[in-house]
């Protein structure tokens, strides 16, 4: 497999020295965020990043709870509550994956063992979007390609600002086809960009 590298500053993945699109870039046409003020969008991105980091540090046992910002705390509490109420084993966390046949990359939040099944968990701090199904399908297929092991479930975990969570199982059988359609559109636009 080609070495997968990620440049944090530019949010760019490269495989074997060639830039490959991210799952987020590929699915961008499904999420019209143009009506959201840029500063609000940036705030939401920063909040999501902080919540992801807090949950990751919590799961690795490295979190200094006194360092958690007040705005992040309810989302972390929601994750801690989910961990207590839904027993699962974490198999992988914040892992970058690359699909060599379809040439895309992404970073999944958690690969877990839940009720005897390997599942993708994608943590969310905002509203639920239809693109989350194709997003988790992309991660599922890349993980399966890399590991040779089946992933049997996909979930968007909605962490809420009141300390609660909602578990959304992604079951639409068309999610993978939607992702591949977006990938074809992404390639077409890049090929014909002026």
Model-derived regions: residue spans:
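Nucleic-acid nuclease catalytic cores
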Residues: 70-71, 95-189
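Short intrinsically disordered terminal tails
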Residues: 1, 192-194
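Metal-dependent nuclease catalytic cores that hydrolyze phosphodiester bonds in DNA/RNA
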Residues: 1-105
């Amino acid at each position: 497999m080609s070495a997968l590298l990620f440049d944090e500053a530019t949010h760019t993945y490269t495989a074997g020295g060639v830039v490959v699109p991210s799952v987020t870039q590929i699915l961008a046409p499904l999420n019209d965020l143009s009506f959201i003020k840029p500063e609000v969008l940036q705030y939401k991105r920063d909040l999501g990043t902080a919540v992801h980091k807090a949950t990751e540090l919590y799961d690795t046992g490295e979190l200094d709870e006194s360092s958690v910002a007040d705005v992040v705390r309810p989302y972390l509490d929601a994750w801690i509550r989910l961990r207590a109420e839904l027993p699962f084993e974490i198999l992988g966390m914040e892992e970058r994956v690359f699909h060599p046949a379809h040439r895309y990359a992404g970073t999944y939040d958690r690969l877990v063992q839940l009720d005897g099944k390997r599942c993708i968990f994608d943590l969310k701090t905002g509203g639920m979007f239809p693109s989350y199904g194709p997003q988790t399908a992309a991660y599922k297929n890349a993980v399966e390609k890399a590991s040779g092991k089946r992933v049997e479930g996909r979930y968007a975990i909605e962490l809420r600002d009141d300390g609660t969570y909602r578990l959304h199982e992604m079951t639409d059988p068309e999610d993978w086809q939607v992702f591949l359609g977006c990938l074809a559109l992404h390639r077409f636009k890049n090929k014909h960009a002026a």
